[in-house]
Amino acid sequence: MKMKAYAKINIALDAIGKREDNYHLLRMIMQTVDLYDVIDIEKSNDSNISISCNKHYVPTDERNLGYKAAVLFRDEFNIKNGVKISIKKNIPVAAGMAGGSTNAAAVLVIMNKLFNVNASLEVLKEIGLKIGADVPYCIEGGTALCEGIGEIITPLKPFENKILVVLKPNFGVSTKEVYTNLDINKIRKHVNIEGLIQAMENDDLDYVSKNMKNVLENVTLKKHTILKNIKEDMRKSGALGAMMSGSGPTVFAFFDDMLTAQRAFEFLKGKYKYSDVYITRTINSNNL
């Protein structure tokens, strides 16, 4: 049984506090984009969970979030069968685009159908939260306000069909390290989430592009100054606005039209030769 597992971007990411367990309390606007991995799962004749992937650098053991999802799902519903999981990876790894989380989400959704468990989305999201804070959102997808550590999800009016260019530099970033180095007291300006939500409801891409904000840029851009150059190059190439997604290092930019986006794509691909560059669009969860 196959399923597309879509990437996400953060149109806004704000940190407003910390829990006792040191997890940051966040307010984020998340958005699904049309860049996806393909997850294919079949039952096996034994009790083993095996993973194969087309990219050699993706772990295929218990470090893989898809593997963790399969283990938790089996435990939760007392399933004895093993599964063979195949991952066709297109989403860049350690990129701030929820590549691992969206794979875990797809594994839970597929296994729910494959074994006729018929668990509700809410139950799947509860299992997903044990794997990672982005997994519940990845199960739901679309345009959403995510609060808490990311698990409190409020669907928003779809902000679909917006053109963007995405650039993932040829290095990864540790999400844990970024959050460890984030000092909430040094955040001088918090994100105007409500203003952004209003603009998105009005389909005002220009306002969204110029006012989107990610407080994690304070940490990641300090360590990787090339990201500032990438953002600047995107703007000079005609972007309405550019920002880092999640903990980085991926940077994305919205464009008014496909021709300008195409030119920016070609320029960025030429300048940042060892980076992954994509043209994609925002999509609604109903497209999943």
Swiss-Prot record:
Enzyme class, spelled out: transferase
Pathway(s) it belongs to: Isoprenoid biosynthesis; isopentenyl diphosphate biosynthesis via DXP pathway; isopentenyl diphosphate from 1-deoxy-D-xylulose 5-phosphate: step 3/6
Catalytic activity: 4-CDP-2-C-methyl-D-erythritol + ATP = 4-CDP-2-C-methyl-D-erythritol 2-phosphate + ADP + H(+)
The keyword Zinc-finger belongs to this UniProt entry's keyword annotation: no
Keyword Nucleotidyltransferase in record: no
A UniProt-annotated Pfam family: GHMP_kinases_N
Binding site for ATP: 92-102
One biological process term in Gene Ontology: terpenoid biosynthetic process
EC number(s) given by UniProt: 2.7.1.148
Catalytic residue positions: 8, 134
TM regions (residue ranges): none
Alphabetical list of Gene3D superfamilies matching this protein: 3.30.230.10, GHMP kinase, C-terminal domain (3.30.70.890)
Keywords attached to this entry: ATP-binding, Isoprene biosynthesis, Kinase, Nucleotide-binding, Transferase
GO molecular-function terms, A-Z: 4-(cytidine 5'-diphospho)-2-C-methyl-D-erythritol kinase activity; ATP binding
Family of the protein in this entry: Belongs to the GHMP kinase family. IspE subfamily.
Function noted in UniProt: Catalyzes the phosphorylation of the position 2 hydroxy group of 4-diphosphocytidyl-2C-methyl-D-erythritol.
Protein name: 4-diphosphocytidyl-2-C-methyl-D-erythritol kinase
Originating species: Clostridium perfringens (strain SM101 / Type A)
